[in-house]
Amino acid sequence: MHYAMEQRCLYDYNLSELTELLQSWGEPAFRARQLYRHLYVNLARQVDQMTDLPLALRSRLAEIPFSTLRCEQVQIGDNGMTRKALFRLPDGAVVETVLMVYPDRSTVCVSTQAGCGMGCVFCATGQLGLLRNLSSGEIVAQAIWASQELRAMGMAGPTGRVSNLVFMGMGEPFANYDRWWQAVERLHDPQGFNLGARSMTVSTVGLVKGIERLANERLPINLAISLHAPDDALRSELMPVNRRYPIADLMAATRNYIAKTRRRVSFEYVLLQGKNDHPHQAIALARLLRHSAPRGPLLFHVNLIPWNPVPGTPLGRSEWERVTTFQQILTDYGIPCTVRVERGVEIAAACGQLAGRHSVPLNTVEQEIPARNVTG
């Protein structure tokens, strides 16, 4: 989809582009490195905080926004350890970002599109349809916001930023591949945000061409694939993308990815009561993965996800006994399997619940705090 915004923001520039911009203004290259450090290491909220830059340069930089994201609402759940931000974009589109804090780490769940065009029936974002792709700067700004929140909470740790990032928010990353990958490279850059590649995970509904591209990238970020069914008939019902990329094609791309990268692949499987959680479906899933695995150590992992309620859908959440039975069957077949720890359900921030709206009843929210923009 065509990117609707015309003006570039500071987070849209990599270091080379910032250098070129500032040199076109008559500034030496080292000024760009100083600016880059303020943006990605110091996490400056305002140009006025960049006191080592000349006043004239700061005045000129003040004419360029850091980001287009405007935070309209932040909701808090899980006793303060989960925060969901709703950002408004200049064209009226909205996206959501979720920060989850644990005793030993922090994870931000980032959106790559406003809405989503994949149409998965169990996902709130899929009901919105695709509004537009995000720019690389709009993706990056979400990680900056999360790190600024951590610092405000006094929980940023020695790195001063989030420790993990998952591209599992609104949208399909591989449908916005170029801008998404630009964001990955900027967040990984050791001269800036310096987030390790293996601390980032991208989730896809199974766009085969995207998996093939990722296999050839230089950064070994983690890959998660939304599977959700062991056969084409059911997967096509739940995920329309399967009609274009059926399971056989998806598994072939996955085998090729593992052969090239020797990296483990996670398969996400949301459990729906009476739909895809029967014992025979667990057996079928185990056999599918065993049959599809390349030779050598099994580099597959299944992440079972109890479905989180989405208004307007006839689906139901699997009973816990069915979840544990499903997990045990996979384990018995030698498939590594875990059940995802739930976070943010009460503020509609959990897996599949992001819908970019204010309509969460406030009596389900532990606390609502005033919004803060990424730039102050």
Swiss-Prot record:
This is Probable dual-specificity RNA methyltransferase RlmN. The gene is rlmN. GO terms for biological process: rRNA base methylation; tRNA methylation. Disulfide bonds join C109-C351. InterPro entries: Aldolase_TIM (IPR013785), Methyltransferase_A (IPR040072), RlmN_N (IPR048641), RNA_MTrfase_RlmN (IPR027492), rRNA_lsu_MTrfase_RlmN/Cfr (IPR004383), rSAM (IPR007197). The active site is at E96, C351. Belongs to the radical SAM superfamily. RlmN family. It is found in: Cytoplasm. One of its GO terms (cellular component) is cytoplasm. GO terms for molecular function: 4 iron, 4 sulfur cluster binding; metal ion binding; rRNA (adenine(2503)-C2-)-methyltransferase activity; rRNA binding; tRNA (adenine(37)-C2)-methyltransferase activity; tRNA binding.
